[in-house]
């Protein structure tokens, strides 16, 4: 087999019969598979050892040669080569066909490639191939022309003869009639009898005339057909064809079936045809030109690729190796076989029968029928079911043909090439491991032993516990005591990868250092659950083992969980306290009025109470039980930095230094909390709501190295769990309090509802108005019950604590639990006007329960649909962006996009832009940011982090120009400077980073949170699409539902208000032609927007509009935006629209991810005029290629091609990629492969997918060429230290991160002192 690292591109083409025979090791002549008695392959059959190789290593069929020493000998008795049995996976055979057949892909695909090449309609082609019509393959024009007059004379003679015969017959009959009539006259017969005789005579004469006329017409038809005879002409009438052959056989040749197609292709002159088509395209119009363009695509493909079109008609069929279509014996003595064997058997049977019929000289009709059946059997083998009814096996199941083996999720591409299974892996249920450090996981001993088996065995031999590998293996299998010690040693410093399906983004696989644990469950650190989206209700996770040194290094440096604290989508920390931890820290930092040991100032006769000289003293007081951690005290601090304002006041310009004392009015809990934060972090004197905790960790991630952040979140986790236990927050029925005012509130609203009902019955309201009124009333009622609930609950109620701390849940859930459920929706998504008045605490009535089930069931169905849709969206996004990789440091472009930082109010104050986090943050500045005085605040090329943005806002700068991937000029991929900071690391993105895939994951991962439904927006007639369908609509560049017109020009609006429609006319400012939009439905309503005077109101007559402005409510069509405003605007429009959907759901994704995808959608140019280039008009060309080709042509003095940018949906863009491997593994596999083969496409292997498919390292990350060539050798010290168990003291974590024991630590054993 050839090594994947020795080639740089992969080409696909058409195989000729010669190629097929060259690959083959012999011809398969018999349909037999294996002998049912001996179970050995039959000679010359589909499993023949002589052709495909021996079934057993180094052993021939007859058993004469058995052993390696005869390697390479071909046995003279049975003809089998002595070699490995594995060659049966790679040796092919072939079947020599008795008659040529066409390849169904090229004839039946849409468009029919054969039809386009030969200029035959697919229907006609089918008639020819399946023996329903003859086709003329060649005509000897010259000979026909020369002898036409002679032939015409002959024809005239023949016609004359027919006419003469007719006249003679008529004459004779007329005379007979006369005689008969005379005879009757003489006999005196009645007039009646005479009339009968006359009628019959005349009828016979009419018949004679008709017969002669038919004969003359036939001759006329034959003659006309012959004079107009041309190649590729179809003759469906068999008699006519026979006559032509009998009379003029030497002037033309004709045939039916694939043979005729083969002859036509042989006589086909590709170059002349291409020239003629180009001529038609230059001068033609309309349909003719379109047809010529389509045909030229196929003809030019053959012309340029040098493929021979003869490859579309096969003289021999290859037989794939037998191990790839195996036959296995089942226990019952029956055999299971691959469908391909059945399909091959049909081909061989029919082929052999055809050979026999031809040898016997059977009549043509029988031979043709057999040829047709052979054609059909080869079609079924290549693509069963493509034409006619599929061939079925037992139980009416269609057989799987070669095409079916490639297609779809279960096909070769997606199942075996992109989704390989890997060795050294295991999976188990996960449980929480609160005692672990952030970079650790608990690995069950048995699983670890199995995973690390080879390492353990080698180490046992090294340490002389075992003599050889075999005995070491036995020791491991019997689990001898010394095995465990060796295992401890082997796993030290060897990271493992944990993965939880579905892996929606890159944090779904992270590396951890394993700790051996008892039991069979993997222990997972609680802080990484967010990234994995894991919980402990029975989730399972898979473990994988990186083997090579490089793999271990990558796992440790790039994938260790403590290095992956930030989300790649938004750049904000994911590893932060949640659930119990939040509650614990919230409890710890709460200040309770009048709690034990509270600070009281000195009075006349009492000293000051609650003042402490140090945190240690306060802890001592707490330990003695005289001070509560939540009581307000005064404490003197020396090791904690005061907040900024106090620091400025107390310590002035020099600032605080460790050891400087200051007094804090706070609680002991808050002091303990602040001691967890890194040294030098300003004191936080607040109650720790989840949001505050998040902002602190955010801040840490911006200011401190990752390792400090990892230590801090770990300390917060420990403290959180400890204090959550201490707080005693539990939920019981007694905690669910129903507000006493509930009944009176509901009675009040019931009265209002009664009134509305009465009005409805009197006819004052119609049905819809009544429903709307009731919905309003009950919404108010629900809110009021919620309000009463809020007031009734005490502050220390556990349920309220959980909600208020931000740990989980929200107030709506509390209201449902204890107040009332409120309004629910029906299956259509409308509110049912009767509310559910009960809370879950009181219990629902039967009717309430029933109406509540609608919404609940719809929710479940919706979630299932959403998950599938969202997964498919992610798959398309990955496919379109998979080859976007950071290729260089800086493309040096001057271009960029302008982002808003703030809005200036009329009074001159700045209001920070709410979306600054996802637009300007983490970008590279494109030009110097200068304030009014001309001072450079931030220089070009700087990274915009939080401090820089604050500096810009302080200087009063409202917008800046930043670099963006939309304007990057790198050819393939993007440059690091245009991309900016990598969200996951907080530093400039590395070269080799696969930013395309990260972008696709960042957009796809929250896809499941988006809603499915389209929602009504304030009485707009058309639904406005939102949620996931809207995101798909945007990325697929579809014309939106409820499309809104946009202004083509800048000018004044003239609005005409009709009965059902608006008509808008724009009078352009530059005096060009007016633009008219009529028939604008009134249901869509006019757009509200900001006017020049700053007011917001609906578009009205006389308003001034800018180019590209939307005129009606709804969504603009991106293709229109592209046409009117150009590529840059449409990119920004798409980014903005996608962000709106995600923001509505509260999902934070950085703009740069969406920009990467949108950039891929606008990569191509459609050619309008080809100039002197090779491009065909109407074809889609990559922009970089288009510009390069134009530069080349202009340099040579030719005409450049003209093109216009085109917006492609992501599916279309994926299929239009230059890599045929990537496109074929995405969708429409057979179509892509057909196309690629005709064009002789070459895959440069630039993207990730194609390299995964052929098994090379991907050209991203450490697989990119500039890193691949680095050589690494371990030093002697490293070799020596390879097996000593290190402690974490000296390297990874600070001293208070001791070695974890792997045993669960009872929380009660923790003293307070651990929190210092």
Swiss-Prot record:
Role played: DNA-dependent RNA polymerase catalyzes the transcription of DNA into RNA using the four ribonucleoside triphosphates as substrates.
Name of the molecule in the record: DNA-directed RNA polymerase subunit beta'
Keyword annotations of the record: DNA-directed RNA polymerase, Magnesium, Metal-binding, Nucleotidyltransferase, Transcription, Transferase, Zinc
GO molecular function annotations of the record: DNA binding; DNA-directed RNA polymerase activity; magnesium ion binding; zinc ion binding
Keyword Transmembrane helix belongs to the record: no
EC number: 2.7.7.6
Source organism (scientific name): Mycobacterium avium (strain 104)
Similarity comment text for this entry: Belongs to the RNA polymerase beta' chain family.
Domain of life, per lineage: Bacteria
HAMAP family: RNApol_bact_RpoC
Note on how the cofactor is bound: Binds 1 Mg(2+) ion per subunit.
GO BP terms in the entry: DNA-templated transcription
Annotated Mg(2+) binding sites: 535, 537, 539
Keyword Magnesium: yes
NCBIfam families, per the entry: PRK14906.1, rpoC_TIGR
Subunit: The RNAP catalytic core consists of 2 alpha, 1 beta, 1 beta' and 1 omega subunit. When a sigma factor is associated with the core the holoenzyme is formed, which can initiate transcription.
SMART domains: RPOLA_N
Residues where Zn(2+) 2 binds: 891, 968, 975, 978
Reactions this protein catalyses: RNA(n) + a ribonucleoside 5'-triphosphate = RNA(n+1) + diphosphate
InterPro entries from the UniProt entry: DNA-dir_RpoC_beta_prime, DNA-dir_RpoC_beta_prime_bact, RNA_pol_asu, RNA_pol_N, RNA_pol_Rpb1_1, RNA_pol_Rpb1_3, RNA_pol_Rpb1_3_sf, RNA_pol_Rpb1_4
Protein residues bound to Zn(2+) 1: 60, 62, 75, 78
Disulfide linkage: none
Co-factor(s): Mg(2+); Zn(2+)
GO CC, any one term: DNA-directed RNA polymerase complex
């Amino acid at each position: 087999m050839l090594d994947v690292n020795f080639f740089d591109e992969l080409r696909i083409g058409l195989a000729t019969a010669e190629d097929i025979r060259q690959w083959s090791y012999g011809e398969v002549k018999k349909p037999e598979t294996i002998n049912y008695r001996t179970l050995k392959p039959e000679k010359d059959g589909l499993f023949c050892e002589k052709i495909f190789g021996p079934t057993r290593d180094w052993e021939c069929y007859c058993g004469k040669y058995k052993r390696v020493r005869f390697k390479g000998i071909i046995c003279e008795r049975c003809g089998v080569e002595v070699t490995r049995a594995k060659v049966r996976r790679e040796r092919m055979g072939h079947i020599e066909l008795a008659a040529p057949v066409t390849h169904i892909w090229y004839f039946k695909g849409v468009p029919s490639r054969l039809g386009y090449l030969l200029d035959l309609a697919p229907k006609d082609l089918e008639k020819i191939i399946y023996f329903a019509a003859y086709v003329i393959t060649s005509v000897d024009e010259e000979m026909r022309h020369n002898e036409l007059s002679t032939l015409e004379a002959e024809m005239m003679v023949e016609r004359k003869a027919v006419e003469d015969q007719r006249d003679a017959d008529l004459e004779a009959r007329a005379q007979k009639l006369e005689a008969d009539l005379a005879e009757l006259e003489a006999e005196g017969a009645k007039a009646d009898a005479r009339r009968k005789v006359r009628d019959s005579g005349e009828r016979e004469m009419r018949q004679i005339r008709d017969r002669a006329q038919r004969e003359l017409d036939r001759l006329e038809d034959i003659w006309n057909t012959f004079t107009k005879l041309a190649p590729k002409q179809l003759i469906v009438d068999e008699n006519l064809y026979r006559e032509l052959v009998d009379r003029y056989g030497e002037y033309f040749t004709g045939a039916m079936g694939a043979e005729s197609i083969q002859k036509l292709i042989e006589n086909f002159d590709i170059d002349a045809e291409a020239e003629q088509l180009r001529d038609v395209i230059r001068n033609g119009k309309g349909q003719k030109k379109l047809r010529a363009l389509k045909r030229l695509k196929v003809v030019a493909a053959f012309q340029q690729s040098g493929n021979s079109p003869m490859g579309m008609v096969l003289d021999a069929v290859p037989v794939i190796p037998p191990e790839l279509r195996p036959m296995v014996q089942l226990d019952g003595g029956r055999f299971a076989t691959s469908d391909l064997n059945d399909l091959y058997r049909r081909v061989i049977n029919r082929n052999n029968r055809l050979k026999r019929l031809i040898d016997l000289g059977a009549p043509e009709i029988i031979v043709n029928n057999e040829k047709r059946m052979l054609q059909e059997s080869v079609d079924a083998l290549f693509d069963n079911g493509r034409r006619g009814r599929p061939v079925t096996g037992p139980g009416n199941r269609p057989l799987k043909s070669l095409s079916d083996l490639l297609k779809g999720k279960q096909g070769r591409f997606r199942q075996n090439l992109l989704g390989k299974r890997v060795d050294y892996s295991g999976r188990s249920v996960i449980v929480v491991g609160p005692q672990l450090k952030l970079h650790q996981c608990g690995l069950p001993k048995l699983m670890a032993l199995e995973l690390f088996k080879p390492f353990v065995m080698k180490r046992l031999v090294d340490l002389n516990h075992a003599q050889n590998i075999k005995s070491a293996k036995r020791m491991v299998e019997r689990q001898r005591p010394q095995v465990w010690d060796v295992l401890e040693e082997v796993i030290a410093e060897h990271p493992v990868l944990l993965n939880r399906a579905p892996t929606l983004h890159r944090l779904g696989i992270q590396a951890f250092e394993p700790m051996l644990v008892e039991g069979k469950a993997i222990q997972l650190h609680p802080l990484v659950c967010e990234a994995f989206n894991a919980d402990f209700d029975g989730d399972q996770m898979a473990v994988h083992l990186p083997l090579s040194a490089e793999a271990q290094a990558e796992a440790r440096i790039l994938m260790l969980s403590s290095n992956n604290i930030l989300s790649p989508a938004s750049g904000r920390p994911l590893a932060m306290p949640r659930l119990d931890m939040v509650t614990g820290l919230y409890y710890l930092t709460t200040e309770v009025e009048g709690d034990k040991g509270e600070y009281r100032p000195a009075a006349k006769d009492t000293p000051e109470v609650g003042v402490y000289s140090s945190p240690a003293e306060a802890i001592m007081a707490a330990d003695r039980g005289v001070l509560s951690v939540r009581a307000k005290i005064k404490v003197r601090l020396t090791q904690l930095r005061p907040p900024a304002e106090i620091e400025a006041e107390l310590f002035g310009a020099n600032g605080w230094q460790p050891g400087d004392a200051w007094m804090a009015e706070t609680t002991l809990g808050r002091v303990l909390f602040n001691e967890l934060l890194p040294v030098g972090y300003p004191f936080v004197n607040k109650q720790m709501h989840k949001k505050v905790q998040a902002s602190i960790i955010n801040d840490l991630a911006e200011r401190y190295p990752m390792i400090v952040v990892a230590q801090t979140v770990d300390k917060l986790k420990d403290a959180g769990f400890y204090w959550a236990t201490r707080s005693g927050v539990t939920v019981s029925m007694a905690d669910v309090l129903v507000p006493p005012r509930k009944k009176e509130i509901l009675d009040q609203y019931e009265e209002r509802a009664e009134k509305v009902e009465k009005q409805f019955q009197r006819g004052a309201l119609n049905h819809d108005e009544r429903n709307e009124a009731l919905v309003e009333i009950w919404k108010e009622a629900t809110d009021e019950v919620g309000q009463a609930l809020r007031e009734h609950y005490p502050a220390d109620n556990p349920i309220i604590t959980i909600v208020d701390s931000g740990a989980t849940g929200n107030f709506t859930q509390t209201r449902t639990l204890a107040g009332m459920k409120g309004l629910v929706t029906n299956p259509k998504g409308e509110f049912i006007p009767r509310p559910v008045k009960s809370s879950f605490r009181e219990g629902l009535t039967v009717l309430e329960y029933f109406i509540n089930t609608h919404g609940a069931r719809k929710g479940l169905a919706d979630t299932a649909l959403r998950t599938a849709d969202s997964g498919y969206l992610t798959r398309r996004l990955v496919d379109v962006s998979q080859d976007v990789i950071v290729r260089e440091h800086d493309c040096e472009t001057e271009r960029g996009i302008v982002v808003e930082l703030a809005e200036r109010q009329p009074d001159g104050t700045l209001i920070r832009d709410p979306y600054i986090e996802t637009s300007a943050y983490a970008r590279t500045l494109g030009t110097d940011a200068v304030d009014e005085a001309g001072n450079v605040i931030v220089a070009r090329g700087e990274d915009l982090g939080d401090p820089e943005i604050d500096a810009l806002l302080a200087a009063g700068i409202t917008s800046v120009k930043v670099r963006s991937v939309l304007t990057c000029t790198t050819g393939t991929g993007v440059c690091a400077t245009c991309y900016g900071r990598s969200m996951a690391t907080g530093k400039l993105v590395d070269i080799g980073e696969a930013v395309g895939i990260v972008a696709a994951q960042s957009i796809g991962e929250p896809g499941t949170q988006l809603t499915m439904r389209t929602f009504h927006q304030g009485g707009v007639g058309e639904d406005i699409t939102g949620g996931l369908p809207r995101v798909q609509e945007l990325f697929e560049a579809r014309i939106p539902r409820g499309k809104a017109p946009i202004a083509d020009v800048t000018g004044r609006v003239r609005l005409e208000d009709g009965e059902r429609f608006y008509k808008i006319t724009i009078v352009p400012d530059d005096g060009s032609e007016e633009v008219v939009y009529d028939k604008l439905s009134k249901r869509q309503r006019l757009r509200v927007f900001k006017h020049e005077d700053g007011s917001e109101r609906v578009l009205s007559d006389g308003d001034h509009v800018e180019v590209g402005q939307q005129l009606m409510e709804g969504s603009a069509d991106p293709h229109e935006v592209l046409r009117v405003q150009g590529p840059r605007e449409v990119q920004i429009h798409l980014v903005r629209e996608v962000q709106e959907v995600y923001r509505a759901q509260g999902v934070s994704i950085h703009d740069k991810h969406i920009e990467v995808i949108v950039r891929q959608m606008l990569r191509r140019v459609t050619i309008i005029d080809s100039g002197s280039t090779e491009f065909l008009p109407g074809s889609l060309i990559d922009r970089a290629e288009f510009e390069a080709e134009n530069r080349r042509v202009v340099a040579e003095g030719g005409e450049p091609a003209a093109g216009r940018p085109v917006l492609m949906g992501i599916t279309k863009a994926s299929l239009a990629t230059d890599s045929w491997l990537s496109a074929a593994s995405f969708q429409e596999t057979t179509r892509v492969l057909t196309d690629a083969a005709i064009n002789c496409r070459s895959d440069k292997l630039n993207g990730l997918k194609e390299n995964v498919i052929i098994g090379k390292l991907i050209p991203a990350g450490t697989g990119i060429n500039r890193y691949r060539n680095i050589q690494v050798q371990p030093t002697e010290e490293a070799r020596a230290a390879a097996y000593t168990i290190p402690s974490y003291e000296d390297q990874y974590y600070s001293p208070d991160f001791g070695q974890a024991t792997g045993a669960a630590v009872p929380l009660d054993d923790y003293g307070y002192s651990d929190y210092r």
